[in-house]
UniProtKB/Swiss-Prot annotation:
One of its GO terms (biological process) is mRNA export from nucleus. This is Nuclear RNA export factor 2. Residues 124-203 form the RRM domain. It is found in: Nucleus, Nucleoplasm; Cytoplasm. PROSITE patterns: LRR (PS51450), NTF2_DOMAIN (PS50177), TAP_C (PS51281). Involved in the export of mRNA from the nucleus to the cytoplasm. Residues 570-625 form the TAP-C domain. The NTF2 domain heterodimerizes with NXT1 and NXT2. The formation of NXF1/NXT1 heterodimers is required for NXF2-mediated nuclear mRNA export. The keyword Transferase does not apply. LRR repeats lie at residues 271-296, 297-320, 321-348, 349-376. Its main location: nucleus.
Amino acid sequence: MCSTLKKCGTYRTEVAECHDHGSTFQGRKKGGSSFRDNFDKRSCHYEHGGYERPPSHCQENDGSVEMRDVHKDQQLRHTPYSIRCERRMKWHSEDEIRITTWRNRKPPERKMSQNTQDGYTRNWFKVTIPYGIKYDKAWLMNSIQSHCSDRFTPVDFHYVRNRACFFVQDASAASALKDVSYKIYDDENQKICIFVNHSTAPYSVKNKLKPGQMEMLKLTMNKRYNVSQQALDLQNLRFDPDLMGRDIDIILNRRNCMAATLKIIERNFPELLSLNLCNNKLYQLDGLSDITEKAPKVKTLNLSKNKLESAWELGKVKGLKLEELWLEGNPLCSTFSDQSAYVSAIRDCFPKLLRLDGRELSAPVIVDIDSSETMKPCKENFTGSETLKHLVLQFLQQYYSIYDSGDRQGLLGAYHDEACFSLAIPFDPKDSAPSSLCKYFEDSRNMKTLKDPYLKGELLRRTKRDIVDSLSALPKTQHDLSSILVDVWCQTERMLCFSVNGVFKEVEGQSQGSVLAFTRTFIATPGSSSSLCIVNDELFVRDASPQETQSAFSIPVSTLSSSSEPSLSQEQQEMVQAFSAQSGMKLEWSQKCLQDNEWNYTRAGQAFTMLQTEGKIPAEAFKQIS
């Protein structure tokens, strides 16, 4: 055993990884593999390749760096530590990821920072989080930092297979990070384990750009910056004439190059709104993930004509609140069955996206919540605060605006990833009388008439993509917003339950113009982006009564009403009619103008005149002259 120790060194110089699936402990077999055999050679790609395309095998020079460190460390150890007599265990798996530890003994740390190689201190540690790929970088780093007794600066955060990894250069921070293991719980109440191991300096540190190179890169980026538009054009950066003339090779797939670029952006372009990374042969976005801290105000990102193969890469920069994104020319674009699926996948990462590859998208449903306003329990009808009323009514206004637009993909942002939706109708297929409900029959999950247990499960739509796809397949509609009543019947700090009643008409097909009534029950929670997020949606559709049909769409109103909020008074209705006659605007636009000016007729008239002079009132606001 002692000879084995001599050959392999101690725990602190070995690389430890964690198996991502199932692993078992077992004693080290006689003649078992040494540290050389246990080293995961796939890490050569990151450690010494800086995120360039992984070669078919690691080069000999690349693979020898850490081996040289291990043998070099042996010269520092002359004291026969008692650790040599401890029992040695090996945790291995089919995935070739192994961890070698010593039981009942912490690694000696007093000499961790003594050795140097090529001018770089060896006081570096690699932190590995198994299954880390499941977690958002910002959440993971904040969670670890909040539990860690020492402040630390993560370097080169990246994902390898389904693990998250980063580096720290502080022995005390490394020790504190070890203590955090199994102290953090994720959303599924699973403990998060953390492994910390001695490492060589990360790629971006060992290959850091020299001051002269940084200065030249900064000058090049300054030339490419548009001050008026706050836009930085870095397309085809590697072949920039100024950089090539100085023999400076900037490859943005390399971590050191991307890190240098983001550092210059942070220091020189803090108000950056638009970044163009077109045609840089990017096949991964690990290096770009730091942009969420370095340039958080970016609204437009151009990643077209690169080598991105999966939409999953975009999750690494989903912290940006993008409004415009370009991806055309990437292999990932051809992985979707149709445009709708493509838009859905991209909007999963960027819910506020308005334009994709230059095409306008339907406006997403995102309603900001006043975080200082706590929802208090309520048993009565809609008797909550005015803030709560405004929140719900504004949400519904936007929701049905998109629902009736003809493209319902914009509703993705309104639903939780694992939301549920069901539709039911009081429809008997044996009824010979024609009905507008026929189109809803095959999606109906009416438990009174549905007996097949398999269909009961199939007709319950799960996940927001399935829900929006199901809604998109339903007939196109126009809802009468003036008919809608809202009843908030349950409120807590983490949940809001409300029902919506009203009528709508179909706007296409054989049933065009048919009026139907509906009841919709929503259960929602505060979303991750300070938005209202639907977790459960039940829709009940029926034929409208003669009275409902007669009154439907008789008085166009642009805002919703709640069951505790009275409709317009007689005086207000007369003001709307008079304002419409004088301005030539439709009733709903006239009402909005009056409401915006607190029903002050004179002030509303002045506002109308000013906006009309400036050409800011759209043509659809005015009545059509036949």
